[in-house]
Amino acid sequence: MTSFKVFTISAVALAVAGLTGCSTTSTKAADVTASVRNSLDQAGLKDVSVSQDRDKGVVTLGGHVPADADKTQAASIAQSFAGTQVVANEIAVVMTGAESDSKKVNAALDKAIEGNLDVAMVKAKLRDVKYAVNNHVVTLTGTVNSPANRKLAETTAAAVADVQQVVNELQVKGQKATSMN
């Protein structure tokens, strides 16, 4: 009987330990989209869009505003809810009455940034790094071999003229997106 009790207790302990080991914790960031949207609306910034990638920990602002101060205010509002998440501020400043001209200038500037970024990435031997440029914000994607190459890609992109922000979504085991303003 004693060996049966020991066996039963051992089996229960093993089952509990196994179940405890199976518990998972979510690495997703908190959903802040509705809170940011509500605060932007209250601030009169209704033309600003909000999206979030909870897996990567990135909150992205888009759309257009008439002044730099509005763009800065939108970023501050988003950051107040985002916590440790990166806020990618892709808002275009488009002056009222000159929307088409402003959009053309922004598109031309983004194209110039892409060209300069192509050259910079080749010089840094980072040809495999993928990126997108939207309203002077560079988003790096893909994979790199080391944390050093991840950092090199970020600093290389940040050094390109007219880049306002770099969102680094490059994957290196165990790391999340970062931002460099």
Language model features with spans:
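N-terminal targeting leaders
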Residues: 2-181
